[in-house]
Amino acid sequence: MHRRRLALGLGFCLLAGTSLSVLWVYLENWLPVSYVPYYLPCPEIFNMKLHYKREKPLQPVVWSQYPQPKLLEHRPTQLLTLTPWLAPIVSEGTFNPELLQHIYQPLNLTIGVTVFAVGKYTHFIQSFLESAEEFFMRGYRVHYYIFTDNPAAVPGVPLGPHRLLSSIPIQGHSHWEETSMRRMETISQHIAKRAHREVDYLFCLDVDMVFRNPWGPETLGDLVAAIHPSYYAVPRQQFPYERRRVSTAFVADSEGDFYYGGAVFGGQVARVYEFTRGCHMAILADKANGIMAAWREESHLNRHFISNKPSKVLSPEYLWDDRKPQPPSLKLIRFSTLDKDISCLRS
């Protein structure tokens, strides 16, 4: 009797277990399952919207009493790589070209270039363009803007794919100083009317120069300046700044970081617009007072860079002079001015 009851109990347990297993399989495979947000630890994340504070633009630097940075601070063969305001100083060996190519190439950037070829300076257009096609921003979209008083003199240099050239007529002036002083105005107006829709970055270069080695995306930045080849190893008291207090380009003996060349500057197109417009307004203020700065637009450029620090600085390998021997501190020359008769060109 006892054994019969035990057998019945075991049978009932087995039947109940089988029924529960079948029921679980049915529920798992046939009944719809829904997940609700409140089972998650942070259900509010689905409706969360971030409200960022508006970006605050950097303000002009007022305090300028600090030691001058020296490009050859360590030893004659080693260049400084960082400014006191943490802007990189670009030179050979400070960047990986292949890595930068992988970073910037997918962005499909368009880089603009402005040059001015007025009067006899039209003779330099061909050598400039041919060297640029060989070395400047290879593999990127490039738009050359040639400002000239003689569009017929612009040669038909073959351009690579995705590389364009626009010849833009401008008025010639009897004095080369006037042409130089009008450059900032012309560039800022061109950006406002056209270039801001066509390019991402804009470099403003001199036409009487040639590229000698690759110039690539290592030069891209918000606002870019190049150190002048004649003053990279001298104290700032010897820089040819405008020293007259009556000029808006005035720089005191205790001010200045590097002396920058007017032949090379650039950056994001919006920043270049602000920069050239600011320089133009300062030039107009001087002109209203009957003043012309010592080195014209270059004096205003240097004054502006003291108060509005460049985000990237190019070493003299990006702005050299063919009349100077290459120093041991520069491993190569990328962009250099040609040896020429200045007095003949400006006559």
From Swiss-Prot:
Residues 1-5 are cytoplasmic. Residues 27-347 are lumenal. Changing residue 296 to Q: Found in FORS blood group carriers; reactivates Forssman antigen synthesis and expression in erythrocytes. It is a single-pass type II membrane protein. GO terms for molecular function: globoside alpha-N-acetylgalactosaminyltransferase activity; metal ion binding. It comes from the Eukaryota. Pathway: Protein modification; protein glycosylation. Its cofactor is Mn(2+). Widely expressed. Expressed at higher level in placenta, ovary and peripheral blood leukocyte, whereas it is weakly expressed in liver, thymus, and testis. Expressed in bone marrow erythroid cells. Glycans are attached at residue 108. Keywords: Glycoprotein, Glycosyltransferase, Golgi apparatus, Manganese, Membrane, Metal-binding, Signal-anchor, Transferase, Transmembrane, Transmembrane helix. The keyword Kinase does not apply. It is an enzyme of class 2 (transferase). Substrate binds at residues 116-121, 206-208, 228-231. GO terms for biological process: carbohydrate metabolic process; glycolipid biosynthetic process; lipid glycosylation; protein glycosylation. The conserved DXD motif is involved in cofactor binding. The manganese ion interacts with the beta-phosphate group of UDP and may also have a role in catalysis. Has lost the ability to synthesize Forssman glycolipid antigen (FORS1/FG). Might have acquired an alternative function in glycosphingolipid metabolism, but it remains to be established. It appears to have drifted more slowly than confirmed pseudogenes in the glycosyltransferase 6 family, suggesting that it has remained under evolutionary pressure. Belongs to the glycosyltransferase 6 family. This is Globoside alpha-1,3-N-acetylgalactosaminyltransferase 1. The gene is GBGT1.
